[in-house]
Each structure stands twice: as C-alpha cells, then as structure tokens.
Amino acid sequence: MSKRYAVVLAAGQGTRMKSKLYKVLHPVCGKPMVEHVVDQISTLNVDKVVTIVGHGAEKVQEHLAGKSEFVKQEEQLGTAHAVLQAKAELAGKDGVTLVVCGDTPLIEASTMEALLKYHHEKRAKATILTTVIEDPTGYGRIIRDDLGIVEKIVEHKDATEKEQRISEINTGTYCFDNKALFEALENVSNDNVQGEYYLPDVIKILKDSDEVVAAYRMESFEESLGVNDRIALAEASRLMQRRINENHMRNGVTLVNPENTYIDIDVKIGQDTVIEPGVMLRGETVIGDDCVVTSGSEIVNSVIGERVHVRTSSIFESKVGDDVQIGPYAHLRPESDIHDHVKIGNYVETKKAVVGEGTKLPHFIYMGDAEIGKNVNVGCGSIAVNYDGKNKAKTIIGDNVFVGCNSNLIAPVKVGDRAFIAAGSTITKDVPDDALGIARAKQDNKLGYAKHLNHGK
C-alpha cells in the first residue's frame, strides 16, 4: 500500500458565524467540528495528518494535540495557498494525499476510504469527491464530457446557464497524487476577482497536462455539509444527532423520542436502557444496562452502573453504582461517588461525597465534602455544613447511622458506627460509636402565655 497523508483545512476565521470562537472549534454533539474530521481520518491508516491553522491556531492545536501535526497559514489567501503551507511536510513524498475541510463534521471514514480506493483504481492524479443535490446554487459544478470523464470544475458565478443546470457538485474533498499536487500548487495563479489561490485550479492544471482526473460520486449530500453560519451548524448538529441516536437504537437502547434526545458522540449506553425525551447525555458519560433516565435529566461526564433509575435529575462528573434510585430533582455535583443500592431522593444535593452501599438520602438534604458509610438513613432537611466562609471541611458518618430530620453536622466532625443523631440537633463535636448525639435547647412551655400575644384577632 502506498503512503497516505491528509491535509485538513482549518485556518478560516468564519466571520459568518459572528462568534468569538473560531469556526472549526464550534461543537457538534460534544466535539469541535475539526476534531470530528481528524478523528475520522485517523481510522484510515494515514501516515501523517497535517492541519492548516490560522485564526485561533493555539486553541485548535490544543484540541487536536497528539492527533495531528500543524502548519500555520499566516495570511488566508485561498485554499490552494493553504494546502501549499504543508510543502515542507509533504512535498516530494510518494503516496496519496487527502484534502478535507475542517468545517465538514459529517464526513465519514468509510466515504474517504471509498474515495481512496476509487482514486487507486482509476490510476488518477486527482480524484474529486462529488455528490448530486437538488439545489446546487453556490457550489462548483463538475463538468464531464460525453464519456463521463471529468473536464473541469466551474464555480457557480462563472458557470454558463447550461452549466448551472448541472446538479453534480464539488464537495471540497479531494484525493491527490502527493507529488503531482505540490508540483501543480506551484503553478496556481491568483488572477481572479478575489485575488486568491483556489484549489480547484489544480484540477485544471493537471487536465492541461493530460493527467487522469476522476470524480467519485457519493450518495449522501449530508456528509459534505460545510458549516459557515449558525443555521448550518444547527443542521449539522441535527444530522449528527440522528446518526448517533440511530446507532444507539441499533445497539439495543430505547429512545422514546429520538428527535428530542440529545446524546454526545462519545457517550456509551448499555442494552435495554430506556432514555425518555428531553434527556441530555454529555461528554464521555457511560450508562450501563437496564437503566431508565426520565425526561429533563442531564448527565455529564459521569459513569452510571446497571439498573439505575434517574428521575429528572442532574449528574455531573460523578460515579453511580448499580441498583441506585436518583431523584426526582436531585443534583449530583462533581466527585460524588454513589455506591450500590443507594437511594438519592428529591431535592438532594451531593458534592465531593461518598455515599456507602444501601444508604438512603430520601429528600431535602445537602451532603458536601462528606463520607457516608453503609446502611445510613439521613432525615429530611439534614445538612453537612462544610464551609465556614473561608475553608471547606469534611464530615464523616460511619455505618448503620441514623441522622434525624433537620440535623446540622458542623464539619469537621465524625459520627461513629451505629450512632443516632436526634432530630433538630446541631452537632459540633464527634459522636462515638453506638452513642446518641443530641444538641438542642430544652423545650420550655410558658403556660397561658399565648393569650397575651396579639394574633390580630
């Protein structure tokens, strides 16, 4: 097999996005557009990937670190000029080079592999990836002769009325003989209205030299969708989301209403899990088998075990074991570690908290910077008071502890195994094993006093 290279064009500023974020870094289903492209290329046994960066170079390099080499295009003088920036990296090498735009997040490895194969079969010096669309307005047209051989690419604004009726378009993705590409790039002119160096001109140069130029037509236009504004970004996200969701459903996940379920590309979901509408699964979240996630839930960069039921709750950067009940309206903040058979009820919030097996936090509870043992019951309204206005401190609760309602555990504090905390207590000292901790004022009833109070009656 000949050497394979790839050049990814990612230098454009993307002014039509009207954004401070550089165009190719806008996310599509949890990943920057350009990273989608590079990740697909990386599956093709490519010997070297060179990403052409310009605006936002440092940020692009940060996202693609370890996946690509980089060359900076100091001035954006057109697509041919951009590819030419890789001259020091690639010129003179035997092999083939893919050229792909960094703003086409839907391009798939299988399509690029088919393009490479077709290029080899045709013994071409250049092969254009094309497709057919109903409304080709604005796209370069593929002009073929009577035998179907590619003659040239004509930009829409330069096309005759007859040529404008052609529906086969240039997608902006190419495969070139590497040596021929860089030799031709040296001869591209900027003698045009925009004063830029255009990559399609390489096709004309090769044709004028009687080299073989081919065109591989793909079935799906959506893979070639370039994102230049927020409308196209939304469309790319919609199409990518459909692709992601259909893949999960084929693998045994039930999406009750896939059109209203938002799952990032790196999320993993086990078989027979049910995801209701309005759920957002973000980042590198992993969900096990036989789970249920109900409407309005958001899970971000978290690991969820098997047979977990999440009811309208938020989970961020946390770990949840098997057979856990969460919600409704629970909030697991980062570094929560919920063990097996735990109940996290409504309006419960945890943060940097370990909750032991079989423990119940039924409702209206805050446990921050806390370590809670096994088979603990924490009553309604109880709080691990972890912040004194300056520093955070830790609360430790042993196994088989009962914490009565409306208890305040003032950290740092430790409650021993099998201890009881009386309802309404404010605990400021450690409670030993098997002890009853009670810290509240003695009730004093003032007999007859109520009649002296003005109740407005």
Swiss-Prot record:
Residues 252-457 are annotated as: N-acetyltransferase. The active site is at 363 (proton acceptor). Pathway: Nucleotide-sugar biosynthesis; UDP-N-acetyl-alpha-D-glucosamine biosynthesis; N-acetyl-alpha-D-glucosamine 1-phosphate from alpha-D-glucosamine 6-phosphate (route II): step 2/2; Nucleotide-sugar biosynthesis; UDP-N-acetyl-alpha-D-glucosamine biosynthesis; UDP-N-acetyl-alpha-D-glucosamine from N-acetyl-alpha-D-glucosamine 1-phosphate: step 1/1; Bacterial outer membrane biogenesis; LPS lipid A biosynthesis. One of its GO terms (biological process) is cell morphogenesis. Binds 1 Mg(2+) ion per subunit. It is an enzyme of class 2 (transferase). Its cofactor is Mg(2+). Acetyl-CoA binds at residues 386-387, 423, 440. It catalyses: alpha-D-glucosamine 1-phosphate + acetyl-CoA = N-acetyl-alpha-D-glucosamine 1-phosphate + CoA + H(+); N-acetyl-alpha-D-glucosamine 1-phosphate + UTP + H(+) = UDP-N-acetyl-alpha-D-glucosamine + diphosphate. This is Bifunctional protein GlmU. It comes from Listeria monocytogenes serotype 4b (strain F2365). The lineage of its organism: Bacteria, Bacillati, Bacillota, Bacilli, Bacillales. The gene is glmU.
